[in-house]
Design a protein with these regions (language model features):
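Acceptor-substrate binding/catalytic loop of class I
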Residues: 93, 152-158, 207-217
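Conserved Rossmann-like nucleotide-binding pocket used by diverse enzymes
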Residues: 63, 86, 114, 159, ...
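Glycine-rich adenosyl-binding loop in Rossmann-like folds that engage adenosine-containing cofactors
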Residues: 21-50, 108-109, 114-172
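Conserved acidic-Pro-Pro-aromatic motif
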Residues: 86, 165-250
Length: 250
């Protein structure tokens, strides 16, 4: 990993989500280099964002499960309001990126943060408000390369919690789930039985069919049928690097 000290971060304003073939964009994000220098900003995952703008509203409580390097959540926050975002990420080093990007773009705090994995079992011994905190490395240097922690390859013993347990402990119930967890999608849903059953959630999930099969012996059909068992119907949005779906009870 390459680290960049906070004082050495170079910031750029990046236009994101081009409006057709015009020179107009839906968003202008303040991003750090080298992230800001990507060449994908015109249309990256545009189908997901358009679906979110169609289905979501200000005030929706949005659980972002797999916040990663901390830029997509800036767009989600614009849609539902930054004060309604719950940021969830297991990789310790990403928390500095998430923190730096968040406060470069917003002056209000997110609703909550959870530094850990979400899955089908709970190993996290923290309780209550201790589960709502920025990752311990959030004030450190940012990283400029991707580094992931996986449920199946958790060599750092990152704590894990079921979504149902998190909801119960912190007292926050989501309206929206956004899940991008590199193949472990079904495990997250299996830890969210009560929340899925008791609510009509708006669910955006990126299904990684290759990683799910390789690392978790799970097919996309397994994940889709599990959600259908709770009364959810799916809408396929797009497939580029993974398959993007939207689910709700209809």
């Amino acid at each position: 990993m390459n680290f960049i000290e906070r004082s050495d971060i170079v910031w750029k304003t990046v236009p994101y989500l081009r409006q057709g073939q015009t020179k107009n964009y839906d968003y202008r994000l303040k991003l750090n280099e080298p992230l800001a220098n990507w060449d994908v900003w015109d249309y990256w995952e545009s189908e997901r964002i358009y679906s979110m703008k169609s289905h979501l509203k200000k005030g929706d409580v949005f659980f972002d499960i797999g916040t990663e390097a901390g830029w997509c959540n800036l767009v989600y926050a614009d849609i539902v309001g930054p004060e309604n975002m719950v940021l969830i990420e297991p990789t310790p080093e990403f928390w500095a990126n998430i923190h730096a990007l968040w406060y470069k773009n917003y002056s209000v705090n997110p609703m909550a943060c959870y530094s850990g994995l979400m899955g089908d079992k709970t190993t996290d011994t923290r309780k209550g408000s201790d589960l709502n905190a920025w990752g311990e490395k959030h004030l450190g240097p940012i990283i400029d390369r991707n580094k992931y922690v996986y449920i199946h390859d958790n060599t750092e013993s990152i704590p894990m919690i079921r979504l149902d347990d998190y909801v119960s402990e912190v007292g926050i119930t989501p309206d929206v789930l956004n899940i991008d967890v590199e193949g472990a999608e079904l495990l997250v849903f299996q830890g969210a039985e009560k929340t899925l059953r008791d609510n009509n959630l708006k669910i955006f999930v990126s299904i990684h069919d290759d990683l799910g099969i390789r690392d978790y012996d799970t097919t996309p059909e397994n994940t889709i049928s599990y959600l259908e068992s709770f009364g959810y119907s799916g809408e396929f949005l797009a497939k580029n690097h993974e398959a993007h779906w939207y689910f709700e009870k209809r």
